[in-house]
Amino acid sequence: MADTFLLEVATPESLLVRDQVSEAQIPARNGYVGILPGHAALLAELGEGKLSYTAEGRRRSLTVQGGWLEVSNDQVRVLANGAE
């Protein structure tokens, strides 16, 4: 099993994040989803809140507002309606 997975965060305007990360906490409609390498496939409605992740040992975050979350084959795609 890999130690990292690919995280992509995009809005209709731009690609905000494309990085190999070791973990992520993502706001879904009904609460936060914790993602680690090897996570099972998942499709979920994105909530509003702070998306945080660890890349190269550094904790980073941004705020997302609605959209979709997809987890598949050690790739996580967040398609957000808005983010900052």
PLM features per residue range, with description:
Residues 4-84:
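Compact, glycine-rich, soluble single-domain proteins
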